[in-house]
């Protein structure tokens, strides 16, 4: 991976750096939001889930307009503006004494992060030929997971001094990237096609809704994100119901470490092999591995079985993430690439709904039923992906194989 990064232009490496640094900034604080909301604002567990989930959903919905801006503006001022919002929102969260202000800051953090993520992915389309993009997507996802793996440890270190300090550290990381991009960012980078006439936001939205491939891929991503978007949350819920707190902590810490190590070590080498010619086959393999992994979770009685099930589940994750990016990349017109990636971000709604739906099932049904429900979501998501891959687009592309 390092050898590949050395061949990339500085502009592309700066975009990839955003994925690492800004993800690290989020990961510093995200694991401690539950504790912070409980201790500082005296919220119950249900209200905490509502706050965290709804801010993610609102940020994802608002990022649709961010994708529109990616297609209309040069990336340099847009990334700098969003990075400034990201930094100031963390500073605001640090000083917020009222829940509504803290809530607003969380929405802004999620929105700014989502728009920068869209700009980064759109930048791949401007800077790389088609056959090199899957490799770049795999590098991006690897760096993202490195950020999520390291961030909680940094957050734990500063939170031991003061529970509010992780927000300051996150703001510092955001400010650091702002300064780096301000000095070395490419001021001419854009996904804008000058020959395209300006189109209102709502008109662009209608165009997207008429692209049935995009609709199918978005629905497929939303349904499958219920399963892999926040798997640690529903696994924790399941273990709390079925085991002791000590066992829950031991299993969760082990499977999370297994997931992180596998993604960091295998994502690049496996993800770069995913090609546009056989996306449906790759995705079917990844989704099948999810189902096998979920079956393993349902049957797990020992730590070893949990680790094996997580290893299989993680292989599915390693395949599905770059395959999803390549699906969107394969159908997105150059002048609407930002909007198409913004539509893909709606999968975060599924990620936010996963713990909620699993909580409802755990409260009303035998505990193992959550895994049967999640398997149904994988099957439904795979069906929408298959339908989208079989629809011939208006751009005369061959159906995906």
Q: Where would I find each of the regions flagged by the language model?
A:
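Juxtamembrane intracellular "pre-TM" segments in multi-pass secondary transporters
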Residues: 1-9, 188-217
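Short amphipathic helix-loop junctions that connect adjacent transmembrane helices
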Residues: 32-46, 233-252
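Residue-level signature of mid-helix packing/kink "hotspots" within the transmembrane helices
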Residues: 56-64, 148-149, 260-268, 351-356
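Helix-to-loop junctions at the C-terminal end of transmembrane segments
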Residues: 62-74, 265-279, 362
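Structural signature of the two symmetry-related core transmembrane helices
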Residues: 77-91, 281-296
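Symmetry-related core transmembrane helices of the 12-TM Major Facilitator Superfamily/SLC fold
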Residues: 166-182, 371-387
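A late C-terminal transmembrane helix in Major Facilitator Superfamily
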Residues: 335-364
């Amino acid at each position: 991976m390092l050898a590949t990064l050395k061949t990339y232009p500085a502009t592309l490496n700066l975009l990839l750096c955003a994925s690492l640094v800004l993800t690290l900034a989020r990961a510093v604080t995200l694991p401690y939001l539950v504790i912070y909301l409980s201790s500082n604002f005296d919220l119950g567990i249900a209200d905490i889930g509502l706050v965290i989930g709804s801010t993610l959903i609102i940020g994802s919905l608002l990022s649709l307009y961010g994708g529109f801006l990616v297609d209309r503006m040069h990336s340099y001022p847009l990334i700098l503006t969003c990075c400034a919002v990201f930094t100031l929102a963390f500073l605001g969260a640090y000083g917020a004494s009222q829940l509504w202000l803290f809530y607003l800051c969380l929405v802004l953090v999620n929105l700014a992060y989502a728009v920068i993520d869209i700009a980064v992915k759109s930048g791949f389309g401007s800077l790389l030929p088609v056959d090199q993009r899957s490799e770049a997507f795999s590098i991006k996802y690897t760096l993202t997971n490195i950020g999520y793996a390291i961030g909680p440890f940094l957050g734990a270190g500063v939170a031991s001094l003061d529970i509010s300090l992780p927000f300051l550290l996150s703001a510092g990381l955001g400010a650091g990237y702002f300064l780096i991009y301000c000095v070395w960012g490419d001021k001419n980078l854009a996904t804008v096609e000058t020959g395209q006439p300006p189109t209102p936001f709502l008109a662009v939205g209608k165009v997207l809704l008429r692209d049935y491939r995009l609709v199918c891929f978005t629905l497929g991503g939303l349904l499958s994100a219920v399963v892999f978007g926040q798997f640690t949350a529903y696994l924790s819920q399941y273990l709390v119901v079925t085991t002791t707190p000590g066992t829950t902590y031991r299993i969760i810490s082990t499977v999370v470490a297994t997931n992180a190590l596998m993604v960091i070590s295998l994502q690049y080498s496996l993800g770069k092999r995913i090609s546009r010619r056989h996306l449906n086959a790759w995705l079917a393999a990844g989704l099948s591995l999810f189902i096998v992994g979920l079956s393993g979770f349902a049957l797990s009685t020992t730590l070893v079985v949990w680790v094996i099930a997580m290893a299989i589940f993680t292989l599915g994750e390693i395949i599905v993430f770059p395959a999803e990016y390549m699906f969107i990349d394969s159908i997105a017109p150059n002048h609407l690439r930002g909007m198409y990636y913004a539509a893909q971000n709606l999968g975060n709604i599924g990620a936010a709904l996963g713990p909620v739906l699993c909580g409802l099932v755990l409260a009303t049904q035998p505990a193992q039923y959550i895994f049967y429900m999640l398997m149904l979501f994988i099957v439904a998501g795979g069906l929408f992906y298959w339908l989208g891959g079989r629809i011939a687009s208006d751009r005369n592309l061959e159906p995906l194989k």
